[in-house]
């Protein structure tokens, strides 16, 4: 039986980097084919070739046994292919309905039939079990809701081949289950699916087969994934055994370094209070919509507080905007690193040196290009940032390497006291996670107070000294590491009316 989709000896080269080297594998109708590998292994590059964004330098793509060449994304869509990238593609000022039907809006004599469009979208969303308001503007939705819109857009095009790149990275448990049901239904309909994820549970739950990438090459393909041990997949991905990804070690903690008392804002149901000691890692866990990120933005001065007091090393501080927080040695690595964490048009070196430049300019000093280059090279080597050189634009790096560059920025900060990390390993492979945890521990050993917001419960349990749990806009409780386990944390995180159902 011929494959619904075949990659035959695909090669792709960028300046200084061989992104793909001789990639070949098949995806069959009625099959979910997992694609795994470290960040920068070439998975997303392959999907961009499939989606018509890039053209291969070698090899060919075959759909139903016929060679195809996609000059652009429109040609790929016309061939019945839908690619849902990790970097979402939408128009923020348009509604859900308008985004879903972009380029296909029903019209008469040049006038869009909005009522007909909304009715059609509402019916299709109901069929897929997705709860979204067709009139809501995309720019006002959460990242999780925007991701569901992208997934629904592909499904509404009735594509025969669907590729999903980290589709659950921002979804809640309930939204993830909706997606899993959609994937199962699509497989039953005979669609061919490619599924990229760093989450082993998802790969084993959804995928029939799996291909492993490393450094742009195919390491292995497994036609019967259920028979392959997880440890083997991890070793194939990273090229080494990782016995304990979290490698937590107890530290001596200092006095309370930072505290927030009675912090309140529009996204919170009640004022929130918490504290962090010097050298302590406090994990914040909660379901999507619990208010964790919103609380951190209030503390950091990114959003206006209605009330609340902040204390640093026993002294009250005034933080009304992000610049105030940074001057006090408080920094935030945001959840949406593409929009808020990196300067996409700048180089890796420039992104790493932002903190150093601020100190130089404040002191009235000239920017020292040689020092900046040495700093960038030191952190590129120290954090194993995969880039052809320091001058590479950071937008061309994988998510994990972008995140390591952001963390390098703050490692270079001499006056750092409080580090807030919002989903620091979202969409990042197991090897890069291991390295990012090293950075977090290094910051804690320097005496920094660390706040880590994460939706991955094993991560929170594995890295944190103490866990604060939020539920529906309020702090539901906290647990010391010794008393924390999945049951105890979820018991605090789940709405009480849904605890039995979710269990």
Curated annotation (Swiss-Prot):
Job of this protein: Part of the ABC transporter complex AraFGH involved in arabinose import. Responsible for energy coupling to the transport system.
Annotated family: Belongs to the ABC transporter superfamily. Arabinose importer (TC 3.A.1.2.2) family.
Membrane topology: Peripheral membrane protein
Enzyme class: translocase
Protein name: Arabinose import ATP-binding protein AraG 1
PROSITE patterns named in the record: ABC_TRANSPORTER_1, ABC_TRANSPORTER_2, ARAG
Alphabetized Pfam families for the sequence: ABC_tran
Taxonomy, superkingdom: Bacteria
Gene Ontology MF, one: ATP hydrolysis activity
Gene transcribed to yield this protein: araG1
GO terms for cellular component: plasma membrane
Domain annotation ABC transporter: ranges: 5-240, 251-497
Binding site for ATP: 37-44
CDD domains in alphabetical order: ABC_Carb_Monos_I, ABC_Carb_Monos_II
Cross-referenced InterPro entries: AAA+_ATPase (IPR003593), ABC_carbohydrate_import_ATPase (IPR050107), ABC_transporter-like_ATP-bd (IPR003439), ABC_transporter-like_CS (IPR017871), P-loop_NTPase (IPR027417)
Main location per the UniProt record: membrane
Localization, UniProt: Cell inner membrane
Quaternary data: The complex is composed of two ATP-binding proteins (AraG), two transmembrane proteins (AraH) and a solute-binding protein (AraF).
Organism: Burkholderia cenocepacia (strain HI2424)
Catalytic activity: L-arabinose(out) + ATP + H2O = L-arabinose(in) + ADP + phosphate + H(+)
EC number: 7.5.2.12
């Amino acid at each position: 039986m011929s494959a619904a989709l075949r990659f035959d000896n695909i090669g792709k080269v960028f300046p200084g980097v061989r992104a793909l080297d001789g990639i070949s594998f098949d995806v069959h109708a009625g099959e979910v084919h997992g694609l795994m590998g470290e960040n920068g292994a070439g998975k997303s590059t392959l999907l961009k070739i499939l989606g018509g964004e890039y053209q291969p330098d070698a090899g060919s793509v075959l759909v139903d046994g016929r060679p195809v060449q996609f000059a652009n994304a429109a040609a790929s869509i016309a061939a019945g292919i839908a690619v849902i990238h990790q970097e979402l593609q939408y128009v923020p000022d348009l509604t859900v309905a308008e985004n879903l039907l972009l380029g296909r809006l029903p019209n008469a004599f040049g006038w869009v039939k909005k009522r007909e469009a909304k009715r059609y979208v509402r019916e299709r969303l109901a069929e897929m079990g997705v709860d979204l308001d067709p009139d809501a503007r995309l720019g006002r939705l959460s990242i999780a809701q925007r991701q569901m819109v992208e997934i629904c857009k592909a499904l509404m095009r009735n594509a025969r081949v669907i590729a999903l790149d980290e589709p659950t990275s921002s979804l809640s448990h309930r939204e993830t289950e909706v997606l899993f049901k959609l994937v199962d239904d699509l497989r039953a309909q005979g669609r061919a699916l490619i599924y990229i994820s760093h989450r082993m549970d998802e790969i084993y739950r959804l995928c029939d087969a799996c291909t492993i990438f490393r450094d742009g090459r195919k390491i292995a393909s497994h036609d019967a994934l259920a028979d392959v041990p997880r440890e083997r997949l991890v070793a194939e991905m990273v090229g080494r055994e990782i016995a304990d990804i979290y490698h937590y070690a107890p530290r001596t903690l200092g006095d309370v370094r930072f505290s927030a008392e009675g912090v309140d804002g529009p996204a919170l149901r009640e004022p929130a209070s918490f504290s962090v000691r010097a050298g302590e890692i406090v994990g914040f866990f909660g379901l999507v919509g619990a208010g964790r990120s919103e609380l951190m933005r209030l503390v950091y001065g990114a959003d206006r507080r209605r009330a609340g007091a902040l204390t640093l090393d026993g002294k009250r501080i005034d933080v009304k905007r992000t610049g105030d927080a940074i001057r006090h040695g408080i920094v935030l690595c945001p959840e949406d690193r593409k929009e808020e964490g990196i300067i996409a048009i700048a180089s890796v070196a420039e992104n790493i040196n932002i903190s150093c430049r601020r100190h130089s300019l404040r002191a009235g000093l000239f920017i020292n290009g040689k020092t900046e280059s040495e700093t960038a090279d030191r952190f590129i080597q120290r954090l194993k940032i995969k880039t052809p050189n320091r001058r590479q634009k950071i937008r061309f790096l994988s998510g994990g390497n972008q995140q390591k560059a952001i963390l390098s920025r703050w490692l270079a900060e001499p006056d750092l006291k409080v580090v807030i990390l919002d989903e620091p390993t979202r969409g990042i492979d197991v090897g890069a996670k291991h390295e990012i945890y090293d950075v977090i521990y290094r910051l804690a050993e320097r005496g920094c107070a660390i706040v880590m917001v994460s939706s991955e419960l094993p991560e929170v349990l594995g890295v944190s000294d103490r866990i604060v749990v939020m539920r529906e806009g309020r702090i539901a409780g906290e647990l010391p590491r010794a008393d924390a386990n999945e049951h105890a944390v979820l018991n605090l995180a789940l709405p009480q009316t849904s605890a039995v159902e979710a269990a």
